[in-house]
Amino acid sequence: MKERIILAYSGGLDTSVAIGWIAEATGAEVVAVAVDVGQGGESLETIRQRALDCGAVEAYVADARDEFAEQYCMPTLKANALYMDAYPLVSAISRPVISRHLVAAARQFGASTVAHGCTGKGNDQVRFEVSIQTLGPDLKCIAPVRDLALTREKAIEYAERNDLPIVTTKKNPFSIDQNVWGRAVETGFLEDIWNGPTKDVYDYTDDPAFPPAPDVVTIAFERGVPTALDGRALSPLEIIEELNRRAGAQGVGRIDIVEDRLVGIKSREIYEAPGAMALIAAHRELENVTLEREQARFKKHVDQRWTELVYDGQWYSPLKRNLDTFIDATQEHVNGEIRLELHGGRATVQGRRSETGLYDFNLATYDEGDSFDQSSARGFIDIFGLSAKTASEREQRLRGSADLQDVARLSND
């Protein structure tokens, strides 16, 4: 029996050509694997048939939209994950779920190697291969673009020569990756970081300079996970999809960043993540209401490290799992509702309520009914400032001694 190679298949030009390219270069049979994480476009059946028409001996397709939303997007939301305080890990969190299906397909079809379409200078090669090696330590990984010299020009020529059922064009200058959590755009004229993005860069969001009337939405959370919009119970996938539509119509979630890649270079990236950014804004505010101060302060450090690990392809690492445990524990009381106004590119908190919150009106109010015992403040201040006061007294004592020595020296002169 011939060796089999699992190929992460998107249905596009590069991976369609990679089926025959890999087979010719290695002599192996290729099994195409397509995973739907909410990227839209063609149906899985259309993609499956194209893979077979391009020479795959088998085609494995998986609708992973709910899995992706519940098991990957929701942990990302709980961690308020924004790499470099901006990027909500759009591509970074899709690679682990795709990798899980690639490894499952390798077991099902008896393959010993997994192939992906990443270049040798991006983050995704690391994310795929680290995830695959973690889930299947016995599996090998190859990348046709990186390892088998498959360039875009060669792919077009190969597709035309072999009459593959795929459109070949050089018209679109951008490299685009998208899923239900967001959309990533790079290359083309965007590589000159002085150039501003043009209207054709965007697809998930409308121009925030010309918004419709404000859209007010109430998001309900249970243990840090959104459960309803405007009183309607919905799944995580449905909530993300609806907020993509509503926040996207208001231009929310546009991000333009020069990003520090894992491989050591800086890269200009454009992201659209209307649903993700609206949810993160709401979740952060609900944490402000429900988390104890020291817990919230420490969680920010954990969130940042969690985000860095996931960006760097360490979704399945021991440390990331340990941080998951801490983050999940902090979400026990993150229950309630946040009211957001979506308008002009912004998701602005207008109201918040929680039965498990730590906001106590009677303690916070300055009006009648104030239950805060202000007489306790003086003793608290004395104790709270004692160490700083003691240090200051030492400095003044030493400075005074030095000043006396200076006066004596001047007198002798």
UniProtKB/Swiss-Prot annotation:
One term under GO cellular component: cytoplasm
Ligand binding (L-citrulline): 87, 123, 127, 175, 259, 271
Any GO BP: urea cycle
Pathway: Amino-acid biosynthesis; L-arginine biosynthesis; L-arginine from L-ornithine and carbamoyl phosphate: step 2/3
E.C. code: 6.3.4.5
Keywords of the record: Amino-acid biosynthesis, Arginine biosynthesis, ATP-binding, Cytoplasm, Ligase, Nucleotide-binding
Name used for this protein in its record: Argininosuccinate synthase
Phylogenetic lineage: Bacteria, Bacillati, Actinomycetota, Actinomycetes, Micrococcales
